């Protein structure tokens, strides 16, 4: 059972590090497809979402 909790803590820490790599750029949007070219230009990858009318880029 101790191993399970250890693995769970490691998983949570890795998830937190991964989520902290998200980048909000100062670009307005209404659809996620509008963010793709902007994120490609900003960080070099088209992985993105439109959240609260702001583009969020993922590495």
From Swiss-Prot:
Stretch forming the signal peptide: 1-22
UniProt site (Aromatic residue of the functional dyad): 58
A molecular function GO annotation: potassium channel regulator activity
Tissue: Expressed by the venom gland.
GO cellular component: extracellular region
Pfam families: Toxin_2
SUPFAM superfamilies: Scorpion toxin-like (SSF57095)
Alphabetized InterPro entries for the sequence: Scorpion_toxin-like_sf (IPR036574), Scorpion_toxinS_K_inh (IPR001947)
Cystines in this chain: 29-50, 35-55, 39-57
UniProt keywords, alphabetically: Disulfide bond, Ion channel impairing toxin, Neurotoxin, Potassium channel impairing toxin, Secreted, Signal, Toxin, Voltage-gated potassium channel impairing toxin
Chief localization: secreted
Subcellular localization: Secreted
Site residues by UniProt (Basic residue of the functional dyad): 49
Annotated function: Potently blocks Kv1.1/KCNA1 (85%), Kv1.2/KCNA2 (91%), Kv1.3/KCNA3 (89%), Kv1.6/KCNA6 (94%), and Shaker (97%).
Family label: Belongs to the short scorpion toxin superfamily. Potassium channel inhibitor family. Alpha-KTx 04 subfamily.
Entry note about domains: Has the structural arrangement of an alpha-helix connected to a beta-sheet by disulfide bonds (CSalpha/beta).
Protein name as it appears in the record: Putative potassium channel toxin Ts24
Organism of derivation: Tityus serrulatus
Classification of source organism: Eukaryota, Metazoa, Ecdysozoa, Arthropoda, Chelicerata
């Amino acid at each position: 059972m101790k191993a399970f909790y250890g693995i769970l803590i490691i998983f949570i820490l890795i998830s937190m590090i991964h989520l902290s790599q998200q980048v909000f750029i100062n670009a307005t949007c209404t659809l996620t497809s509008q963010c793709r070219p902007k994120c490609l230009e900003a960080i070099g990858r088209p992985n993105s979402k439109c959240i609260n009318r702001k583009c969020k880029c993922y590495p």
